[in-house]
Amino acid sequence: PIRFHKDNKRVYIQTNKGDSDLIELALMDAETGAVTKVEKDPLGKVDLGAVSFSEISKEIVATTYVDDKPRVYFKDKDFERIYNTIKNRLGDREINFQSSTRDESKWIVSTTSDTDPGTVWLFDRKSGNLQTLYQIREKLNRSVLSPMKVIRYKSSDGLEIPAYLTIPKGSDGKNLPLVVFPHGGPWARDYWGYSTYAQFLANRGYAVLQPNFRGSTGYGKKFLNAGNNEWGQKMQDDITWGVRYLVEQGIADPKRVGIMGGSYGGYATLAGVTFTPDLYSAAVAIVAPSNLKTLLESIPPYWEAVRVVFYKRMGNPNTPEGLEQMRRQSPLSYADRIKTPLMVVQGANDPRVNKRESDQIVAALASRNYPVEYLVAPDEGHGFARPVNNMAMIAAAERFLAKHLGGRFQESMTPEVAKRLMEITVDPKTVKSASSNTNTAPAVNLSGKWLFTINAGGQSHVIRIEITQNGNTFTGKSESELGTGTIVDGKVAGRDFTAILRAEIQGQTIDITVEGSAETDSMKGQFSSPAIGNLPFTASRDN
């Protein structure tokens, strides 16, 4: 739903239900549910982006469709005149009407562009006066920023991929070092406009490619669904073929291509260096899934409602076919192929991409003495939010990219940032992961009934768990006063073990990571999840 129609009986909605590929504007009768289509993209290319209303007439004054750049279709001639007046004064900027006085005589207007993170204005409708109120990031020198342009290229199967390319300002745009920056999601998209990372990398001398690979949103159901079950396959081809296109155009130097991204972009980074190991000369993977099976097993409780969507788009781990697909599409399965210099960045408290996703790939590389740089911030989650952590990561990443791709980097950093960088830098040889643990000692036998004791809030709680072990793997069932649960993905390496306790507590399913070590008749370790934090435990046999 968008808002009520002025008759207060119908509701404006956006929908692509049925045979419609694109999201359209429609009206739904609140009583009968009958839907009447109002408008879809006149060019038939993208989903509905936004609908603007007059708060006086309650009528639609404009609709917007975000193609390569936004396209605006006016329904009110006076509003169109105001828009064009501002557009003619400010040039190639995107204009957004934020709010107005009750009589709509004065407007707060914001503008953005590829070289302007944002400026806010006061527009007087009667006088036509346009007054600057403030700039976002006012200390940023706009004159040194690099322009972003729209490109399109064909992927491996001929599908056209929309993308954005930022070329360093002042360069001739030829034979440049390139950094591919895939977006996260992956069910999201990049837009034309100001991009912090694109500008930072361009400032350091790199061309920056931001592809909207299949599976990205905004381009209709067919384009979105074309990414179903294509992680690491055609979705990755869409990125690879973008690199090839820029090399063929003479823009990118094939010997100086890097890839950097976070979340799904981090997955694409790891996929790039495992599935196309000869393509990249440097890679920075930020909060990156390395194992699709363990990624889905660690879905946080507040995502439980969309688990079925993940299974549809990524494969169902509860079927043999789904498990094989996930193994095939997981970069961890091919870690031995990696020959690209790699930096891995992780937040220790990430509820979406668990730390073990990074630990697994780092441990796999360390086990064969392959050099990898690893940063772990203990006070971060899915991405870095604290300025000192972000600055430390950027300082490390730009030095790393410069070393392998030849761009510039700032050698100096504040003592605070330098200290923090030292604190979050992890020696890969100290990283342990159940999937890559090289401990060859016989697996301790965990089979049987156990009493786990945890202390939470000053009170002791007992959990009874019965474990069934088969070689180096185990499953189990739990029971406590709080609820029941099942043990899944249990792994034993020597005396060390990890597992997921999928607990049913007060009608909610919570995945809790269980890590520890065991003797014949005792265990100790930790339960951890975003919902409960970190809770140490001890355990003994329940005889």
List each language-model region with its residue ranges.
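Peripheral, non-catalytic segments that deliver or gate enzyme domains
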Residues: 1-162, 167-174, 190-204, 245-248
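Conserved hydrophobic/aromatic positions in well-ordered beta-strands
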Residues: 26, 61, 121-123, 164-166, ...
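Extracellular/periplasmic ectodomains of large secreted or surface enzymes and adhesion receptors
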Residues: 56-57, 62-66, 72-92, 99, ...
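Glycine-rich His-Gly loop
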Residues: 65, 112, 181-186, 263-266, ...
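Short coil/loop residues immediately preceding or within conserved phosphate-binding loops
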Residues: 148-150, 160, 254, 326, ...
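Short substrate-entry loop that stabilizes the transition state in hydrolases
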Residues: 171-176, 181-220, 354
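Active-site-proximal cap/loop segments of hydrolase catalytic domains
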Residues: 211-444
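Central antiparallel beta-sheet cores of small beta-barrel/beta-sandwich binding domains
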Residues: 442-543
